[in-house]
UniProtKB/Swiss-Prot annotation:
GO biological process: [2Fe-2S] cluster assembly; protein complex oligomerization; protein folding
Similarity-based family: Belongs to the HscB family.
InterPro entries noted in UniProt: DnaJ_domain, HscB, HscB_C_sf, HscB_oligo_C, J_dom_sf
NCBIfam families per record: hscB (TIGR00714), PRK03578.1 (NF002935)
Keywords: Chaperone
A Gene Ontology cellular-component term: iron-sulfur cluster transfer complex
Protein name: Co-chaperone protein HscB homolog
Quaternary state and interactors: Interacts with HscA and stimulates its ATPase activity.
Function: Co-chaperone involved in the maturation of iron-sulfur cluster-containing proteins. Seems to help targeting proteins to be folded toward HscA.
GO MF annotation: an example: protein-folding chaperone binding
Length: 175
């Protein structure tokens, strides 16, 4: 029997690894939700309803975490005792720092020129960069290179923030 304290992977009876079969995760989630959904316990006592709600909440949280590659990577690293240090570890490779500056300048220039096409192109570039880096992250995690994976997670978090800023700029310019 799985407990509320077991890992997300254990909850869904999946291997604790980065590479996951999305269909297997979806199926496992539906199975767990079917078993613990609060509607199944409508006629039960308050204690059982509360427990069902806890399990349903836990299943939703676990599913959201495992469904998102970046969250899954962060979670895997936390299970391995690796703190990604996103709040206080901002040290990054010089090449990535240069890339950050280029992206920021691209955002500023395109926003100042009200150039939505340039922002769209930058957003596409960021999405491609994220895809490539997530593939690399999977290789790092599944090979046990946890410190390099933590660095990759921090970089991906930055890429997501920049992509969000680009999206906000596009929205602002289109309204």
């Amino acid at each position: 029997m799985v407990s509320l304290k077991d890992s997300h992977f254990d909850l869904f009876h999946l291997p604790a690894q980065f590479a996951l079969d999305d269909a297997a995760l979806d199926d496992a989630y539906r199975t767990v939700q079917t078993q613990v959904h609060p509607d199944r316990f409508a006629a039960a006592g308050d204690a059982q309803k509360r427990i069902a709600m806890q399990w349903a909440t836990r299943a939703n949280e676990a599913y959201r975490t495992l469904r998102d590659p970046l969250q899954r990577a962060s979670y895997l690293l936390s299970l391995r005792g690796v703190d990604i240090g996103a709040e206080n570890n901002t040290a990054m490779e010089p090449a990535f720092l240069m890339q950050q500056m280029e992206w920021r300048e691209g955002i500023e220039d395109a926003a100042a020129a009200r150039n939505v096409d340039a922002l769209d192109a930058l957003l596409a570039e960021l999405r491609d960069e994220k895809r490539v880096r997530i593939e690399r992250l999977g290789t790092l995690l599944d090979s046990g290179a946890d410190q390099a994976a933590a660095e990759a997670v921090r970089q991906l978090m930055f890429i997501e923030r920049v992509a969000s800023e680009v999206g906000a700029q596009i929205e602002r310019l289109e309204t």
